[in-house]
C-alpha cells in the first residue's frame, strides 16, 4: 500500500478521515434529515433472527434455577474485582438501578427494557463507572442460560435477588425485556459536549424546569449530582433537583424517598484516592482492555483502593443488612462537610457512636465512619421530605411496603401493561401506573357480526374522515419506548385524551356519541352474550372507512381486524400520567401545537419511531391519510387530490409533479408553503414542511416515487393497509407477534 495513503499512515489525515469510508454524508451536511432511527435494531444486526421470540424463549427458562445461581454469585467474591463486605448485592443493585433509572416519562425512552447499559453512551457514562465489572460478573449466568435469559432481564433480576439476599422486601418480578444488539439512536440525551465532572453544568437554572424530555440534571448522570447542584453542597437546592428529576421519571415524593432510602441502606461509595489516576471509560479504552474501562493506577485499583464516584464510605453501619439504620443516621445526627480522599464533597456525622461506625469493606476488623451525600441530606432538610422520612422511621412496615413497590415500579415502568410481564413472580395486583384495562369477559364479535357492524358504521352518518381520524387518534398515542398508549382501553373517550387539542374535542364527542349508540344497539341485540367494546368499534370504524375509500378508488381490500380490546374505566386511568402522551405535533394529521426548535419533519420521524414504523410505512401512511382528509381542523395542507375521501396515490403523484413550484407563504416562517402552476402561476396547493419533505429529502423522494408510479395503485393500497394495521395493533400484546407487527405471511 502507498505510504502516502491515510490507510497506511493515519497521522497524515485528520481524525474525521481515518476511516475506510471517509467522511459521511452527515459530515458534509450536518442538517440533513436522518431516517436512521426508523431502521435501528433491524434483522441484519440482530443475531437472533426474525423468527426468534424472546417471550416464548423466556417461558422455557428454569426461573428458580437462575435465582439460585444469582444467590450463590452474591457471595462468590472474585479476585479480579472483589466484593465489598464479601457481598456483591449492593453492586448489582446499583447496576440494576442505573439500568432502569434512565427512564423518563416525557417520551418513554431510556429504562431497563432493552439492556442498553451494555452500549454507548450509557456503558461509558461517568455515573455508570465500574458497572462494566458488574456485568462481567454476571456473564457466567448469562452464558449458562443463553437465549432464554436476556441481559435486560438478567440485570434487573440480579438487583431483585440482591435485595432478597440481604433481607430486603421485594414486590415481585416480571420478565420479558428483549435485548438490543446495537446502541440506540433515537434517545435524546442532551446537547452538552462535556460530561458531568468534565465541564457539564446543571440543566436547572434558578430553579426553572429544564428541557423536555430530559430527566437527569447533568449530562452523564442518572438522576442528580450527589455532591449538590453543580457540586455545590446545598441540601435545599438538591431537594429541588431531586423532586424535579424524579417527577420526570414518574416518581412522587414518597416513592422517591422510599427508593433512595432503601437503596442507600446498602453498600458504599468509592473514592479511595486521586480520581486523576482513573483510566478511560470503556468506549475510549484500549483494545486490550476488552471492553473494560476506568482502570485505576491507585495502588491495587480495586477493593479498598477503588475509585468510582469520588465519594467515599457507606451510608449505614450495616451495609449488607436490611434495617432502619439509614433513617437513624440521617435524622439523629448532625453533619459536617468534609472532603473524601478523592476530593469529593460529602458529609460526616459529628461524634458518631462506636456502634454507628461501619466495618471496612475489605478489612472488617477496621471501623470507619459513615457518610451522607448532599442529596441524602436533602431528605432531612426539606420539610416535606423530612415528614416522610420521620413517618417511615416510625413505621418500618410502611417503609418496607413503600420501598418494595417503588423498586418494582422503577424496574418495570417501561414495560407497558402487565400482560407483557412473564414469569412466576408477577404480582397479581393491578397498579395504576401499569395503565390497567379489564379482561375480556364476554364472547367476541364473529365475522358476520363484524361485517354487519361495518355496514352500520358506514350508514351512521359519519364520514370516512370521521371514522379514520378517530381510529388514528385512538391508536397513535402508542409509544414503543415504554409500550404505553394505543387503542386498547378506548381511553380517547376519557380525560385527558378527550380534551386534547389534537383530537378536536367537539368533533370527537360527536363521533363517539354515534359509536356508543352503535355499540349499545349491538350489545342489546347480539345473541349468545356477544358484545363489542368501544375500543374495538373505534378501530373497526377506521377499517370500514378505509375499505370504503379503497373501493371508491377502484380497489377491493379487506382491512384486517382482530376483536378483543376492552374499555378502561376512569378509575383505571391516571389523568396526570397520561398527560405526557399528548402529541404536541402529529405529522400524520398535519398538526403542530407550538413551534419547536427543531424542524417539524424531525418531529414526524420521532413520532414514527415511537410507533415502530419504518420509513416506507411512515411514507405510505402520510400519503394515504392526507387524501382521506384526516388533517387537524380540516386543513387542506398536503391534501394533493381533487377526490378527497378516496384511497389514491394522488398525494405522491401531485407532490412530484414538476409543473408545480413551491415557495414559503411568509418569509419569516418556514412552515407553510404554497404550490403554484409554473405555467399559469395559479395557486394549486398548500403544504407544510411535513408534506414537502417527501419530495425534498432524497430518501423519502425515492420512496414517494415508488408510490407515485403509474403501476403503484394496488401496491400503495396494500402497503397502506399493512402499515395502518400495524399501528392499530401496536398495543395488542395478546395477539401473535407476527399479527401484531402486521407482517406478511
Swiss-Prot record:
- Report what the Swiss-Prot or TrEMBL entry states about this protein's PTMs: Formation of the three residue Trp-Tyr-Met cross-link is important for the catalase, but not the peroxidase activity of the enzyme.
Q: What InterPro entries is this protein classified in?
A: Catalase_peroxidase, Haem_peroxidase, Haem_peroxidase_sf, Peroxidases_AS
Q: Which SUPFAM superfamilies match?
A: Heme-dependent peroxidases
Q: Give the co-factor note.
A: Binds 1 heme b (iron(II)-protoporphyrin IX) group per dimer.
Name the catalytic site residues: 98 (proton acceptor)
- Membrane-crossing segments per the record: none
Which amino acid positions bind heme b, per UniProt? 264
Q: Where is this site: Transition state stabilizer?
A: 94
Q: Please give the family membership noted in the entry.
A: Belongs to the peroxidase family. Peroxidase/catalase subfamily.
The protein's matches in HAMAP family, at most eight in alphabetical order, are given as:
Catal_peroxid
Q: How does it assemble?
A: Homodimer or homotetramer.
Protein name per its UniProtKB record: Catalase-peroxidase
Lineage of origin: Bacteria, Pseudomonadati, Pseudomonadota, Alphaproteobacteria, Caulobacterales
